């Protein structure tokens, strides 16, 4: 099966509309990703077909949330190689996207991806979530925070919820372990001003992978002491 067919049929399987032009943007993204991956560690997934499924379709599955609209301000926290933020921006061009990562080289890669795929309204921020989340330029400025980061949920919410404005949403992608992590994260979610409003189980097309999407609504402001200093959330999670 051709790569464009994997994307087209996979998107249909997820009930997501995607145009030929958007498919071409994603394929261009894949080319740049695999080229840069030769010189720096961006992804362990190197087969073209797997990039389509495990990176692109997985990222696009966030669109299954009834709370994610076609426009608004979004920040991808700890974006790494751009997932899920860049595929979401390609599929939802009305989104204003901020990509946050702590590694300068990854930001340089993302700048090239967005230039080559002609993505506008993208802001690149080099820094740690704990520091940027305390900046008045970014704190509680976003309709959506998204993350596919590997931290435990009670840590991830401290990284992400401070960026979300009251009435906005944190859309978190995790594996099956999210079911076990949720009870441990309930206090952190509440303390940081959030409330779980949606849980979705996603069977990823062309794979045997099941992922989960957790949507947390920001119902009140995050107390000013959060996020705590860099390293503190992961060493001493809110419990």
Curated annotation (Swiss-Prot):
It holds the Pfam family GidB. S-adenosyl-L-methionine binds at residues 78, 83, 129-130, 148. Keywords: Cytoplasm, Methyltransferase, rRNA processing, S-adenosyl-L-methionine, Transferase. It comes from Alkaliphilus oremlandii (strain OhILAs). One of its GO terms (molecular function) is rRNA (guanine-N7-)-methyltransferase activity. InterPro entries: rRNA_ssu_MeTfrase_G, SAM-dependent_MTases_sf. This is Ribosomal RNA small subunit methyltransferase G. The keyword S-adenosyl-L-methionine applies.
């Amino acid at each position: 099966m051709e790569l464009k067919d994997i994307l087209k049929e996979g998107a249909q399987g997820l009930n997501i509309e995607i145009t030929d032009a958007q498919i071409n943007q994603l394929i261009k993204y894949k080319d740049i990703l695999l080229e840069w991956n030769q010189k720096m560690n961006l992804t362990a997934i190197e087969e073209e077909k797997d990039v389509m499924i495990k990176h692109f379709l997985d990222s696009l599955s966030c669109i299954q949330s009834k709370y994610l609209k076609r426009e608004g301000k979004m920040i991808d926290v700890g974006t790494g190689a751009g997932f899920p933020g860049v595929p979401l921006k390609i599929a939802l061009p009305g989104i204003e996207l901020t990509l946050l990562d702590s590694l300068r080289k990854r930001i340089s890669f993302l700048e090239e991806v967005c230039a080559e795929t002609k993505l506008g309204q993208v802001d690149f921020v080099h820094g740690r979530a704990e520091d940027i989340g305390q900046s008045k330029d970014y704190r509680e400025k976003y309709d959506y925070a998204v993350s596919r980061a590997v931290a435990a949920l009670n840590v991830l919410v401290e990284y992400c919820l401070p960026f979300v404005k009251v009435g906005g949403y944190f859309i978190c992608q995790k594996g099956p372990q999210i079911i076990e992590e949720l009870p441990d994260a309930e206090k952190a979610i509440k303390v940081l001003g959030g409330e779980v409003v949606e849980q979705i189980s996603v069977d990823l097309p062309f794979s045997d992978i099941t992922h989960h999407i957790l949507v947390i609504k920001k119902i009140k402001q995050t107390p000013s002491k959060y996020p705590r200093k860099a390293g503190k959330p992961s060493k001493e999670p809110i419990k």
